[in-house]
């Protein structure tokens, strides 16, 4: 099948690799190179780099909402468009430009976690099951019909990186199965109940509320690493918690109280045992290394 591919980050790479192997990728659309590192050198997106290596024509428009781009897409000899974490809204004229429309890989149990941050919200909300869906896109926000779906259980303390990699690889496999059977698949309309929205994360969400349960805070730590990171302030400095574990233990302490010299912290319910931290502008350290340089005393009440 002849394919136009639209995507940008690492999450989209396994799918493009599979398409290059099994189909004919006629063109790739991705975000423009961005300044990176101290030298602010322009860096191609992971999808741009992969397409470049395979000599596939690459386009980096600043929007899809203009006639020039729509005409360009109409001229590309393709049967279908695949869109994965591209970063731009796809207008109706492009959604309907090819025989089989536009397909999308969405890493959640739709209609749960529609929107920009389904992986993060899955972990933050403490979900124990999830799915990867192949969806035919329409003009709504992740409201299209489901062509193929695979459910799976989540390990209790799965990290964002682990879930990202699992869904990226599973989505790539499902995409190839979908394309192989596309003429025989009966699309399934998403149910109207159970709809939630996975809104984009904000930096403010990362600030710890010690009145929440240790379990909830641990979910946030795993779901918000690396960005925005979960943090507290101590001596007017921001300290991120990169790794922790929660203990379902009863206590009588005020929420936010450091109850041991190993940085165990009383929460609204349960105790958070911190394992890895990073002070602003410094490197990440395990708890032993961190406490050698920053002594947070027992009985301190953190804010």
Curated annotation (Swiss-Prot):
NCBIfam families from the UniProt entry: fmt
Q: So which residues are the signal peptide here?
A: none
Q: What does this protein do?
A: Attaches a formyl group to the free amino group of methionyl-tRNA(fMet). The formyl group appears to play a dual role in the initiator identity of N-formylmethionyl-tRNA by promoting its recognition by IF2 and preventing the misappropriation of this tRNA by the elongation apparatus.
Q: What transmembrane ranges does the database entry give? A: none
Per the record, GO CC terms?
Answer: cytosol
Which residues are noted in the entry as (6S)-5,6,7,8-tetrahydrofolate-binding?
A: 108-111
> What CDD domains does the database record attribute to this sequence?
FMT_core_Met-tRNA-FMT_N, Met_tRNA_FMT_C
The organism named in the record is: Rickettsia peacockii (strain Rustic)
Q: Which Gene3D superfamilies match?
A: 3.40.50.12230
Its name, as the record gives it, is Methionyl-tRNA formyltransferase
Q: Which InterPro entries match?
A: Fmt, Formyl_trans_C, Formyl_transf_N, Formyl_transf_N_sf, Formyl_transferase-like_C_sf, Met-tRNA-FMT_C, Met-tRNA-FMT_N
- Family in the record: Belongs to the Fmt family.
An example molecular function term from Gene Ontology annotations: methionyl-tRNA formyltransferase activity
